[in-house]
């Protein structure tokens, strides 16, 4: 279904000079947009009954390739200012996601309808499913996969695993409760 995009991403991964081509940049941005919408994932369940997952390396490569093609820019919200390459996610009302003040998610992170973000942070490539609460000061790292009806308690750190691209991200399966101040990293799989 996404074979053409996959081919372009794999070629650009092997030859970074191709990132100068606007068509290649568009392909990278398209993959990140699909991740943002939850239509592509950096990792996905293969057999949920056995808790088996596969890493979509080419999607992770696209996320990594997104960084060098994005220009640095100033972003403002009232008197607050940021200077970064990554846009922030927006349109939460239309997405059906509750987001309280001080919560931040980067564009390229999927947050499902019914999820709740307390003052927290969700990084690019992450997937947060419906009914999940990312509680106060919790962080969801790049490419982490968080299931349905999960509670990431206050101060939880879910590590991100962008590289190496073949490495499994942190996976928290459906209905898990991760207690306050826990740190889950380096491809851990909680089910």
Identify the meaning behind each predicted range.
Residues 101, 106-107, 112-113, 117-119, ...:
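Left-handed beta-helix
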